[in-house]
Every structure is written in structure tokens, then in C-alpha cells.
């Protein structure tokens, strides 16, 4: 029997990345669920990026009554780099018991001028000036343009989801709750168990 996974997005790139990642390990049925992340269109900082991913995952698992909910957010997070931040994708996987695992994609530095705009809430493709490519967020992403297609947004998202699956695949004995991870990130996200009693 297939495991149902709800992705908290209406973005087909995120959907395909989650489908590819989960299909490596599970017989899976993936559904898209439109949810609010609780953060702006360009999240920045660990609290917003991790909090947004967790919120998407929680709302997806609750709304779809699925086995897993997956949330993905991208944005600059604090890290030792030229501008003090790197752009990354964070994936959160939440189960019916409100246990959460987190994974990150490969990350890259962002030009300081672009970073300043992103930290003010301007979406990356607009801040970089590549909006003329149209719909980058739902295609190769800025990373696809920057790497001439060697790495795409779907690749980054898929890798983040696979990283978030590791504790579940390896059977880690203790998986944190949504609230525990949110608190570590400086965010506030609540989850209520959807497991039938």
C-alpha cells in the first residue's frame, strides 16, 4: 500500500522533487496541498526559512490527513560567508505524531547587493534581475541560470528532502517534535497529532 505524502505547495518543481526523493525509498502517493507558510514571499534567516518549512509541512499533513507532510522553503540563512549568509533550501518532514526531521540542500553565497534586497523581502529572481527569465521559481531557479543548468532548483529541493529523510530511513531512536525544532530555530510553529485514536 502506498504511503501518502502531502507537499505544502502549489509549485510543480517542489512536487516533482518530493516525488522523486520519496520514490527512492517508499511506494508513495504524493499530493500537492496549497497552504500558507506564515512567512513572506522571500523568507530570510533561520527562523523564517526553517519556520516556514515546518509550517508548510504541518499544515499539509493536517489538511490532507496524510502519513507525512513536507514543507520546503528557500532563502538566505546566517552562515560564515562573504555577506554573512548563504542561499539554501530547507525541507521539513512532519508525521502524524508531529515528529519533524529537517534537511538542507547544497548552499551558495549571494552577492551582497542582492542579499540586502532579499533581507528586505525582495524575492531572489527580482533582486538578481533575472525575472526576465520568467517563472524561475517554477523552473530551473536562479541556481539553474547561475550554473548553466548543472544544478537546478529541483535538484536542490530533492537533495534537501533526501537529507530530511535520513533520520527516518536510519531509524533514529529519537526524533524531535515540531515545537522543539521550531524553538531551536527561533520560530513558533505548533502541531496537533492527526493520528486516529
From Swiss-Prot:
Catalytic reaction list: XTP + H2O = XDP + phosphate + H(+); ITP + H2O = IDP + phosphate + H(+)
Cofactor note as given: Binds 1 divalent metal cation per subunit; can use either Mg(2+) or Mn(2+).
Protein residues bound to Mg(2+): 36, 65
Positions with a binding annotation for substrate: 9-14
Disulfide linkage: none
Cited Pfam families: NTPase_I-T
Single GO BP term: thiamine metabolic process
GO molecular function, one term: ITPase activity
Keywords: Hydrolase, Magnesium, Manganese, Metal-binding, Nucleotide metabolism, Nucleotide-binding
Annotated EC: 3.6.1.73
Annotated InterPro entries: ITPase-like_fam (IPR029001), Non_canon_purine_NTPase (IPR002786), NTPase/PRRC1 (IPR026533), YjjX_NTPase (IPR050299)
Required co-factors: Mg(2+); Mn(2+)
Family statement drawn from the similarity comment of this UniProt entry: Belongs to the YjjX NTPase family.
Function field: Phosphatase that hydrolyzes non-canonical purine nucleotides such as XTP and ITP to their respective diphosphate derivatives. Probably excludes non-canonical purines from DNA/RNA precursor pool, thus preventing their incorporation into DNA/RNA and avoiding chromosomal lesions.
Protein name: Probable inosine/xanthosine triphosphatase
Source organism of this protein record: Aeropyrum pernix (strain ATCC 700893 / DSM 11879 / JCM 9820 / NBRC 100138 / K1)
Amino acid at each position: 500500500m502506498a504511503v501518502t505524502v502531502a507537499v505544502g505547495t502549489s509549485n510543480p518543481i517542489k512536487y516533482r522533487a518530493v516525488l522523486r526523493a520519496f520514490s527512492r525509498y517508499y511506494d508513495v502517493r504524493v499530493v500537492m496541498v496549497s497552504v500558507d507558510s506564515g512567512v513572506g514571499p522571500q523568507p530570510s534567516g533561520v527562523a523564517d526559512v526553517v519556520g516556514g518549512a515546518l509550517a508548510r509541512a504541518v499544515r499539509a499533513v493536517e489538511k490532507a490527513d496524510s502519513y507525512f507532510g513536507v514543507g520546503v522553503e528557500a532563502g538566505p540563512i546566517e552562515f560564515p560567508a562573504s555577506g554573512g549568509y548563504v542561499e539554501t533550501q530547507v525541507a521539513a518532514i512532519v508525521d502524524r505524531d508531529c515528529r519533524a526531521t529537517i534537511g538542507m540542500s547544497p548552499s551558495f553565497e549571494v552577492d551582497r547587493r542582492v542579499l540586502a534586497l532579499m533581507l528586505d523581502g525582495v524575492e531572489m529572481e527580482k533582486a538578481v534581475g533575472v525575472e526576465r527569465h520568467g517563472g524561475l521559481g517554477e523552473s530551473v531557479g536562479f541556481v539553474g541560470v547561475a550554473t548553466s543548468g548543472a544544478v537546478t532548483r529541483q535538484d536542490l529541493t530533492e537533495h534537501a528532502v533526501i537529507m530530511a529523510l535520513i533520520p527516518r530511513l536510519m531509524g533514529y531512536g529519537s526524533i524531535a517534535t515540531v515545537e522543539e525544532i521550531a524553538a531551536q530555530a527561533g520560530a513558533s510553529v505548533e502541531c496537533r497529532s492527526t493520528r486516529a485514536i
